Swiss-Prot record:
Residues 9-91 form the Phosphagen kinase N-terminal domain. Its EC number is 2.7.3.3. Signal peptide: none annotated. Disulfide bonds join C201-C271. The lineage of its organism: Eukaryota, Metazoa, Ecdysozoa, Arthropoda, Crustacea. The keyword Disulfide bond applies. Residues 113-127, 127-155, 204-218 are annotated as: IgE-binding and beta-hexosaminidase release from rat basophilic leukemia (RBL) cells. Glycosylated. The keyword Transferase applies. One of its GO terms (cellular component) is extracellular space. SUPFAM superfamilies: Glutamine synthetase/guanido kinase, Guanido kinase N-terminal domain. This is Arginine kinase Scy p 2.0101.
Length: 357
């Protein structure tokens, strides 16, 4: 049972949300009085409460979603709040649906989407994983951060072939190494105000680090927003090569580190927007003609469930007609289907761009 001080804070937070008429978050939409009363006294076995789930969304009323999971059990215990939010965000993943088992599919179906190198600047595929037996950021102790980092770094140091590389802990990092990682766009910073308010940045930089292979085409972030972010990327449009590298890395890491998985929701992550496959496959792509015809761009993107962002990610402009385009769907489909849909959409966009020239 949550203690009285927590419940008092929750009551205040709920009042604040109710009064915020211009707040458009999914938290506000689905945290009704009856759901609130049903959940406010509950506590996971690791001690997380509804306050851990909603505090970022209460503090940041401009949140799009507004909830985070403090540990794996939270998705089950606080399901009356999480389930409708998940259904709303992952369009069509109903509360009765079950995410399919992991299936990377036939990796040879993926190709170089731009063999002439005229449109695609770079290609990236990432996924998120949580280590079984550990809560998510807000509930981790300093000792757990250190223990997780040593498990991750020793696992990664066993990687061979093109995945072989170096682990750089953020703790005690020299200015030179730091600058080198910033120049390569590899270094992650301490979390933004949304993550700060969710208590995702405690004991920073303890337990955080970055691994990359010698070619700088494979990267792992340890204890950034998720326990693990596994990233494969390179210049040009060879999605096949990027995907195959990611799949072999995930399979290697999984042999040594068990991942948190949920029967209904797939792989578990700190933020409910990343659940399921957790896979985001993206390209930086130059589409000058389509950039001038945004309506057509959005129409094709909609047809293939693609998300179109500015060059530097969410809430940014497309610099010089360069877009960041990725798959939107993460739940209710396999890893293979998610990336295949993105490949089909990108091929279609390139075809239309060529026709418009």
């Amino acid at each position: 049972m949550a203690d009285a001080a927590v419940i008092e804070k929750l009551e205040e937070g709920f009042k604040k949300l109710e009064a915020a008429t211009d707040c458009k978050s999914l938290l506000k939409k689905y945290l009704t009085k009856s759901v609130f009363d049903q959940l406010k006294g509950k506590k996971t076995s690791l001690g997380a409460t509804l306050l851990d789930v909603i505090q970022s969304g209460v503090e940041n009323l401009d949140s799009g979603v507004g909830v985070y999971a403090p540990d794996a059990e939270a998705y089950t215990l606080f399901a009356p709040l999480f389930d409708p939010i998940i259904e709303d965000y992952h369009k069509g993943f109903k509360q009765t649906d079950k995410h399919p088992n992991k299936d990377f599919g036939d990796v040879n179906q993926f190709v170089n989407v731009d063999p002439d190198g005229k449109f695609v600047i770079s290609t990236r595929v990432r996924c998120g994983r949580s280590m079984e037996g550990y809560p998510f950021n807000p509930c981790l102790t300093e000792a757990q951060y250190k223990e997780m980092e040593s498990k991750v770094s020793s696992t990664l140091s066993n990687l061979e072939g093109e995945l072989k590389g170096t682990y750089y802990p953020l703790t005690g990092m020299t200015k030179d190494v730091q600058q080198k990682l910033i120049d390569d766009h590899f270094l992650f910073k301490e979390g933004d105000r949304f993550l700060q308010a969710a208590n995702a940045c405690r004991y920073w930089p303890t337990g955080r680090g970055i691994y990359h292979n010698d070619n700088k085409t494979f990267l792992v972030w340890c204890n950034e927003e998720d326990h693990l972010r596994i990233i494969s990327m390179q210049m040009g449009g060879d999605l096949g090569q990027v995907y195959r590298r990611l799949v072999s890395a995930v399979n290697e890491i999984e042999k040594r580190v068990p991942f948190s998985h949920h029967d209904r929701l797939g792989f578990l992550t700190f933020c409910p927007t990343n659940l399921g496959t957790t896979v985001r496959a993206s390209v930086h792509i130059k589409l000058p003609k389509l950039a001038a015809n945004r309506e057509k761009l959005e129409e094709v993107a909609g047809k293939y469930s693609l998300q179109v962002r500015g060059t530097r990610g969410e809430h940014t402009e497309a610099e010089g007609g360069v877009y960041d385009i990725s798959n939107k769907r993460r739940m209710g489909l396999t890893e293979f289907q998610a990336v295949k849909e993105m490949q089909d959409g990108i091929l279609e966009l390139i075809k239309i761009e060529k026709e418009m020239q």
